[in-house]
């Protein structure tokens, strides 16, 4: 009896099980202990009676439990089919033990019979408990040992329904979907911050670093079963959202633009995503502006007149163009000086054949005696030289441009046309007046006024300097990006002008010496006051008018102060972007040479001071032909001991190719 109790206690529950399962196991253990004591007593009594009687039935010395054959089967059909009918009630288990195992105990030998009986009972109970646990685990996952396959519980239900003749879909509406297809997850560790997503989310973009299994394999950590990237953590939120949203890329506010751009390039999201992101950030595409003509001769001409940094001749042409523009602007301003304006008016009157004004003055020289005409005027000669250069430059650029449609859509080319046309219109009008003679003083005065207006357009030549000035280009980009803010500023000023001009008019209506005779007369005062200029030519006199003027000045300060910071922010953005581009150009010039890169090609890449026309074309075509000039990977990898040096050279060469 003592041996039986010790054997029963030795097969106790596992103390490392969870609390709920451990309590149930202890309850079952107490039931088995009581049952074992009763069974041991009955077995000892039966064995003693059998020895004394000297007889007994000759049966097999050991029988398996009736349910063990079904429980231990690993057949995928019979084993799974028997799982649903295998769990008897605990009370039935007790009866089953008594009816199946105990009648055969009479054949056991007295020596050690109690210990063997208890061992068999304990093993059978443990096997039944293990099978019950396996059946519970089978609800989620099942392993077929014979075939080495892994399938979900829903697959087993589908197989049982199809092969075992089970009716319906079963499983409470579960479908036959593989576990790996719907629930396969991947863990991504970015500098210690772990992200978890599904494989199908990354598979939407198979060309990217995370979407291509082969590309991301080199970052896999088998010990932690995760992918590790030593990259910027805040940027990865937007990178992962790019996969989750199906292609929407938005930079976090706490990540600088250059850092986020590097992360986008590292994760290989593609050029299309990068270009779209740059457009959202305010960048302007320049692919069309950077296009080159297909004809070689036109290409050289286009490089000379369009890209001053291409070569020394192109830089010289740019300097000449800037000087001509400055001379034209200086002449436009000097001809309005009083000492030159009288002669200019006289020449214009002589050319138009007028007989009034200066010509009616007795002190004025007579037209027949004066040898001055518009064609021998120094200002006209200088203006003609400038126009000849502008016309030549425009015609050559129009001839060599890659696309005529894009050429005439460019705002800089439109400015060139506007700056050239007034000269030819003025020249044609002067020639027509000289050939036609005097046709009336009123008609001549009208034509003279029109010519003055047309000549005023010459002031737009100053915008031609923006072609050669980065500062003016930045200002143009700033104004174009701030059109909405400028529109709001004008709208606010318009509302303020209407409001305060009306208020000051009615406030000063009873004052006889007031300057505000009408509301339109007060518009000028409202604009000057709101912009804090304050000329003082118009001012309120009454107390009510002064109060309105004070409110107008305060409202003007607030109105201008609201949109101005946004405009300044846009200017800083474009300025820093231009600075970053210049820094990248300097880094490109300091790139380490590759041993397989031709020295003359690298020399022309580092400095563009050559004198031939073909140098810049080769410089700009380097992006297309650099792959043929750089060392191939196979050649670099076949150097043996110099593999590390070759790898560095390849990386530097790639940097050169990217920066170009």
UniProtKB/Swiss-Prot annotation:
Compositional bias (Basic and acidic residues): 636-647
UniProt biased composition (Acidic residues): 122-137
Membrane topology: Multi-pass membrane protein
Location of Phosphoserine modifications: 122, 607
UniProt GO BP: action potential; potassium ion transmembrane transport; protein homooligomerization
Listed name of the protein: Potassium voltage-gated channel subfamily A member 4
Glycan-modified residues: 360
Superkingdom classification of source: Eukaryota
Stretch list, region S4-S5 linker: 470-483
UniProt source species: Bos taurus (Bovine)
Lineage: Eukaryota, Metazoa, Chordata, Craniata, Vertebrata
Positions of short motif Selectivity filter: 532-537
